[in-house]
């Protein structure tokens, strides 16, 4: 198929390890466009990149213009501005909502979202709640969403896999908290990529949710033992009840070098069983699922970065000179976001009577004026 005749597919989160693995496969059928916060040239399956900050609705609208299909791989685990107020769940909602609004405006036919497995007992950590919330927000503006829910993705550059691999490499004797007895169903990166490729542009999978996982279910301790075998390391695992989640976060960060902001929500999720529900998707796609041991060996053999992208602590000069501030509030019954905003702009100049005035412009919205200085 000639490049000009290929449908245009937009990938948000193109620089992540899943996005990098996806593009070469999808490029066989699509004109693949990656979204990036900074300007960059196409390559490795991406026909082009578009500069886009998903915290800006206007940026999102420009970036999705002309697209037919979209894949959403964004997860705001680490700060991306000079000053960030709000946690990862708040930031994720803003980006997902902007993306969904822009997709609806651009006439996108389908959004494919890579989310997280949900425990069968219904209990969710904040991290897993955020994944479900993003799934809901993406579907909130009329574009059909196909969701693949996965647990730990076994890929060389994946942050979760790198954390586990570094623990095994650096600790000959591993003192294991209770959560290491929790059952999990990880999945090979290659399987995830194949299944995403399969569901894109298939109407039968619009507005559907699929759990994906390896053929077997193991505990986290067994998963670390598999990693030790793949690395050729002899390791001893000692179960303890002493390590609290807080202590676990601290020692994992110290041993692996992973930022605590990344480790904390992941550790919170480890007490929940991450087991895939029944799904015929792999069979339908003709995919023979990769065993966890094989997936781990492939991940270790892969040419992954010395320092994973998610582990890098940005220097102050690397972050945009921006403030990202997101606060949530519970609206009283009968209120809307607009009525709350209007009440705020009426209250603020009364509270700061001699300091601040609020001007309303029908085209531009509201502006705030510091009275003593005349600064808008």
What are the language-model segments listed below?
Residues 2-29:
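N-terminal Rossmann NAD(P)H-binding glycine-rich loop of SDR-like oxidoreductase domains
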Residues 121-233, 250, 257:
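Oxidoreductase cofactor-interface core, primarily capturing Rossmann-like NAD(P)-dependent enzymes
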Residues 12, 35, 73-74, 111-117, ...:
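SDR active-site strand-loop-helix element
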Residues 31-37:
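Conserved glycine-rich Rossmann-like NAD(P)H-binding loop of the short-chain dehydrogenase/reductase
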Residues 105-110, 143:
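A short helix->loop->beta-strand "cap" motif at the edges of active sites that frequently abuts
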Residues 19-20, 93, 132:
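Residues forming the Rossmann-fold NAD(P)(H) cofactor-binding site
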Residues 40-106, 117-121:
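NAD(P)H-binding glycine-rich loop region in Rossmannoid oxidoreductase-like domains
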Residues 3, 198-262, 273-375:
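Mid/C-terminal beta-alpha module of Rossmann-like enzyme folds, strongest
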């Amino acid at each position: 198929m000639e490049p000009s005749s290929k449908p245009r597919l937009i990938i948000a989160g193109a620089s992540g390890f899943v996005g990098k693995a996806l593009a070469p496969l999808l490029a066989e059928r699509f004109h693949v466009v990656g979204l990036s916060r900074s300007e960059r040239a196409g390559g490795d399956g991406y026909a082009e990149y578009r500069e886009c900050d998903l915290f800006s609705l206007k940026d999102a609208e420009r970036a999705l213009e002309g697209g037919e299909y979209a894949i959403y791989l964004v997860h705001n685990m680490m700060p991306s501005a000079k000053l960030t107020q709000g946690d990862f769940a708040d930031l994720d909602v803003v980006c997902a909502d902007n993306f969904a609004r822009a997709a609806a405006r651009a006439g996108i036919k389908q959004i494919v979202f890579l989310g997280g497995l949900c425990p069968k007992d219904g209990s969710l950590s904040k991290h897993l709640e955020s994944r479900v919330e993003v799934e809901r927000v993406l579907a909130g503006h009329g574009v059909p969403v196909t969701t693949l829910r996965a647990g730990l993705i076994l890929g060389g550059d994946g942050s979760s896999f790198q954390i586990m691999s570094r623990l095994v490499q650096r600790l000959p004797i591993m003192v294991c908290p209770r959560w290491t007895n929790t059952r999990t169903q990880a999945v090979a990166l290659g399987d995830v990529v194949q299944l995403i490729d399969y569901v894109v542009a298939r109407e039968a999978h619009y507005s559907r949710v699929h759990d994906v996982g390896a053929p077997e279910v193991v505990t986290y301790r067994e998963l670390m033992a598999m990693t030790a075998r793949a690395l050729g390391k002899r390791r001893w695992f000692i179960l303890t009840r002493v390590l609290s989640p807080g202590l676990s976060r601290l020692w994992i960060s110290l041993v692996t070098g992973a930022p605590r902001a990344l480790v904390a929500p992941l550790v919170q999720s480890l007490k929940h069983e991450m087991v895939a529900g029944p799904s015929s998707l792999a069979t339908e796609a003709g995919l023979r699922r990769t065993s966890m041991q094989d997936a781990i060996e492939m991940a270790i053999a892969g040419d992954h970065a010395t320092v994973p992208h998610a582990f890098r602590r940005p220097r102050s000069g690397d972050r945009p000179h921006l403030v990202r501030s997101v606060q949530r509030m519970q609206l009283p019954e009968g209120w809307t976001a607009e009525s709350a905003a209007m009440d705020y702009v009426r209250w603020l100049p009364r509270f700061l009577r001699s300091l601040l005035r609020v001007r309303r412009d029908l085209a531009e919205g509201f502006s705030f004026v510091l009275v003593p200085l005349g600064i808008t």
